[in-house]
Curated annotation (Swiss-Prot):
Keywords: Acyltransferase, Cytoplasm, Fatty acid metabolism, Lipid degradation, Lipid metabolism, Transferase. This is 3-ketoacyl-CoA thiolase. One of its GO terms (molecular function) is acetyl-CoA C-acyltransferase activity. The keyword Ribonucleoprotein does not apply. Its EC number is 2.3.1.16. PANTHER family: 3-KETOACYL-COA THIOLASE FADA, 3-KETOACYL-COA THIOLASE, PEROXISOMAL. The gene is fadA.
Amino acid sequence: MSLNPRDVVIVDFGRTPMGRSKGGMHRNTRAETMSAHLISKLLERNPKVDPAEVEDVIWGCVNQTLEQGWNIARMASLMTQIPHTSAAQTVSRLCGSSMSALHTAAQAIQTGNGDVFVIGGVEHMGHVGMMHGVDPNPHLSLYAAKASGMMGLTAEMLGKMHGISREAQDKFGARSHQLAWKATQEGKFKDEIIPMEGYDENGFLKVFDFDETIRPETTVETLAELKPAFNPKGGTVTAGTSSQITDGASCMIVMSAQRAQDLGIQPMAVIRSMAVAGVDPAIMGYGPVPSTNKALKRAGLTIADIDFVELNEAFAAQALPVLKDLKLLDKMDEKVNLHGGAIALGHPFGCSGARISGTLLNVMKQNGGTLGVSTMCVGLGQGITTVFERI
């Protein structure tokens, strides 16, 4: 395919192994250290990329306090081979933060404001809890439903509106673990996981090159035994059908097509379109529907043109209505989250957008796909989507 000089291409992608936030492999590793290790190793893997050419390190992170405060992008960048003459910024769109980081870099490239960017994100939910230091304005309840800030209840609401049964959610949750375990066993994550030192359950230092979050023993029957996590009376959303609380980071090297050509680099993919959209915060999980429809329209495509989709699995009760209204339910086993998703791998907020996008590119490569969509819902009612074409 022919590319325009200012087209945005993905050169490479890597991520850390996903660690459990409670006593997991990353319990003694700080978020900046995790991020810096990932950036350094990805640059080492791409010797044609000169770190001095990096215009900006754009890093997603939601809870920007404690070790994740004071512009963690810059903190991490200073710990890598990227010189201090390159800039760095931290961005937040809650769950969509690192996909927003990608979009910010892409928009800069498209407008001639840089050629080489490092993007990604991190969330160490074991060290910085998701509600640490958060003080929501009580007056928000005058403008949005009081439960809009309680993600599990918004998932309950969306599931009820779309008639999603408890059994359907349990099946989706079990599918995530089974597919993630299958991908692990078959080495499908090998290209994306960059090994990291961490600590096992006995406190011994070792190198991890796998996700410790996957539970291969998960079945529909075991999930059916769990109690509702958010609505004790009549609720259907459980811990087993919700994204796991985990620690992790993800990273991409992004370039203009012209610079990649000049350097003799074969990119993984080109960005065809991007979009964000808002929805009622009470049904925040529905955001991927309008954002994906908008992105597809901008690319001149329909959902039928798309070979593979990565949808962030915030909750099964949220993912299934999205797939239903995107006309993907009957194509799920062929196209959607073929390596599992956040129910098995977890959802470290700042990490997930780049993580699902990179996993999508590997799924496309492994299965011969050409067009792919990565999309996710965002707390307080947003959706964000990227359409990629594999090169």
